[in-house]
UniProtKB/Swiss-Prot annotation:
Protein's cellular compartments: Cytoplasm
GO biological process: chromosome segregation; DNA recombination; DNA repair
Gene this chain is encoded by: recU
UniProt cofactor note: Binds 1 Mg(2+) ion per subunit.
The organism's taxonomic lineage, starting at the top: Bacteria, Bacillati, Bacillota, Bacilli, Bacillales
Organism: Bacillus pumilus (strain SAFR-032)
Family: Belongs to the RecU family.
Keyword match Metal-binding: yes
CDD domains attached to this UniProt entry: RecU-like
Protein name according to UniProt: Holliday junction resolvase RecU
UniProt entry keywords in alphabetical sequence: Cytoplasm, DNA damage, DNA recombination, DNA repair, Endonuclease, Hydrolase, Magnesium, Metal-binding, Nuclease
The protein's required cofactors: Mg(2+)
Entry's Gene Ontology cellular component terms: cytoplasm
Described function: Endonuclease that resolves Holliday junction intermediates in genetic recombination. Cleaves mobile four-strand junctions by introducing symmetrical nicks in paired strands. Promotes annealing of linear ssDNA with homologous dsDNA. Required for DNA repair, homologous recombination and chromosome segregation.
C-alpha cells in the first residue's frame, strides 16, 4: 500500500469511459480529466511534434515495508509519497530550460498560497536566477491560467508582509494569462512561453 505524507492511502484514478473531444470553449470545471492528465497529453503532443521536451518529475517514494517471498523477488507492502522538493515539470524549449508547477483549487473566490511550500518558491527563484523560464499553471474558477513565477513571488512575499494567504480571483485573472482549452494540444502553455520570452523571434504557431 502506498500512502501520502498525511497518511491517506493512494488510490489510482480509474478510467470512467470513452474520452470525448473537448472544444476550446468548454469550461474546465465541467471536464472529466484532471489537470495533470491534460498536461501529460499536452507534453506528449509537444514531444511527438518536435516542439518541446517536457516531462513530469517522478514523485519520490519512501519504502517502509518490503516482503521477500522468494530470494529473487521483492514485494513492496507499504510505502509513502514523500514531499517533492522542487516542482512538477521540467524540460527544454528552444534551448531554454523550462520549469513549472501545476496546481488546482475548488475555491470559487481565491487561490490559496498554502498550495506551495517555501522550498518550492526558493527552487523557482534559483531557476529564474540562472536564466530558466519558470511559471505556474493554475486550474481555478473553471479556467486554466499561466502565472509567471515573478508574479507568484510577489503574492508570496505579500503574504509575509500583511498576512493575506491567497491570490484573489480578480488578481489571478489580471496577473495570469488565460489559456483557451483545445483538443490537441489540450493546454497550449508553450504559446504563452513563446509570447512572453520569444516574441521577437517567434517560430511557434
Amino acid at each position: 500500500m502506498i500512502r501520502y505524507p498525511n497518511g491517506k492511502s493512494y488510490q489510482p484514478i480509474q478510467p470512467i469511459g470513452t474520452k470525448k473531444r473537448i472544444s476550446g470553449e468548454s469550461s474546465y470545471s465541467n471536464r472529466g480529466m484532471t489537470l495533470e492528465a491534460d498536461l501529460n497529453e499536452t507534453n506528449q503532443y509537444y514531444l511527438v511534434n518536435g516542439i518541446a521536451v517536457i516531462h513530469k518529475k517522478p514523485t519520490p517514494v519512501q519504502i517502509v515495508n518490503v516482503d521477500y517471498p522468494k530470494r529473487s523477488a521483492a514485494v513492496i507492502k507499504e510505502a509513502y509519497f514523500k514531499q517533492s522538493s522542487t516542482t512538477d515539470y521540467n524540460g527544454v524549449y528552444r534551448g531554454r530550460y523550462i520549469d513549472f508547477e501545476a496546481k488546482e483549487t475548488k475555491s470559487t473566490t481565491s487561490f490559496p498560497l498554502k498550495n506551495f511550500h517555501e522550498h518550492q518558491i526558493e527552487h523557482m527563484k534559483q531557476v529564474e536566477k540562472q536564466g530558466g523560464i519558470c511559471f505556474v499553471i493554475i486550474s481555478a474558477f473553471g479556467s486554466v491560467y499561466y502565472l509567471p513565477a515573478s508574479d507568484l513571488f510577489f503574492f508570496w512575499e505579500r503574504q509575509k508582509l500583511n498576512g493575506r494567504k491567497s491570490i484573489s480571483k480578480d488578481e489571478l485573472m489580471e496577473a495570469g494569462h488565460l489559456m483557451t482549452l483545445g483538443y490537441s494540444p489540450r493546454i497550449d502553455y508553450i504559446k504563452v512561453v513563446e509570447t512572453l520570452h520569444f516574441s521577437d523571434e517567434s517560430e511557434y504557431q
